[in-house]
Regions:
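Iron-sulfur (Fe-S) cluster-binding modules
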Residues: 1-95, 105-120, 134-173, 177-257
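Membrane-embedded and interfacial regions of multi-pass energy-transducing membrane proteins
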Residues: 100-101
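N-terminal glycine-rich "phosphate-gripper" loop used for MgATP/nucleotide binding
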Residues: 122-126
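Short, well-ordered alpha-helical microsegments
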Residues: 128-131
């Protein structure tokens, strides 16, 4: 049940910020993405085939909402290390945490993949999972959270949409590439007839998400995931049931009476 702790952060003041004033932290980043831990059974099912897994926390939004930071990654490592979750021996786990998984420069500069790692279990939002998956292709990157909803950012610049906070993350089965956000039609059964030579019909400069998914899974030797029959997607966690709200008992107005 032991695991090794790896910290990837370039400034210790951020660690104090994460565990200090959460309001200040949220304001500092100028954005807020909320995620919920996936059911433990789903996580175990996704990782049981691997032998050595890096559980990777993210020190930004999901730390603020108490879902995917250093502390939560450590707790998940402890729980997943328990033999009772597996038919055979459990995988070996190592834990790390970087400042932001959604920034490619930080992922490359401050993240070291331990030797022998055959999968990464990411506690980031969907954008972070995909950034790590792109950086370490073809190493499988598995989401441990369901990204639920996204706040606004007023920062200048350009951002590429990678996640829509559908609340039912499927990146485990699509090679770390989101069909909801990155397919123009949010298709779940492969490319449409308008896809040509790896490009989407909306424009040659827009890659076809399903072409990317296919070739990513091919590099991972996991094309069999495309043959599996899955239940229709549940869109209710994505906001189809009305505006969403997260409550953490014991914090501010969410304090239990």
């Amino acid at each position: 049940m032991s695991f090794r702790l790896l910290i990837f952060a370039h400034d210790l003041r951020f660690t104090r910020l994460w565990r200090g004033n959460y309001t200040t932290s949220s304001h500092y980043w100028g954005q807020m993405i909320v995620g919920d831990l996936k059911p433990l059974e789903e996580i175990v099912s996704a990782i049981k085939e691997y032998k050595q897994i890096l559980v990777l926390g993210c020190g930004s939004c999901v730390t603020v909402c108490l879902s995917g930071g250093e502390k939560e990654a450590e707790q998940l490592c402890h729980e997943l290390s328990k033999v009772r979750h597996y038919e055979g021996a459990p995988p070996k786990f190592e834990m790390g945490c970087i400042l932001r998984q959604c920034e490619e420069d930080l992922v490359h500069e401050y993240q070291t993949i331990p030797e022998g790692t055959d999968a990464i279990l990411s506690l980031a939002c969907g954008a972070g999972v995909q950034t790590v998956a792109d950086a370490h292709d073809p190493l499988p990157v598995i989401p441990a959270l369901n990204t639920t909803f996204l706040g606004a950012s007023a920062k200048p610049g350009i951002w590429a949409e990678m996640c829509r906070g559908c609340g039912d993350c499927v990146l485990t089965y699509t090679g770390g590439i989101c069909p909801v956000a990155r397919c123009a039609k949010s298709l779940f059964n492969g490319p449409c007839g308008g896809s040509q030579n790896g490009s989407c019909e909306v424009g040659l400069d827009t890659p076809c998400a399903w072409a990317m998914i296919y070739y990513r899974l091919k590099r991972q030797d996991k094309l069999h995931l495309l043959d599996e029959i899955r239940a229709p997607k549940d869109w209710r966690p994505g906001g189809a049931g009305g505006p969403r709200k997260r409550i953490r008992l014991g914090l501010g107005e969410g304090k239990s009476s």
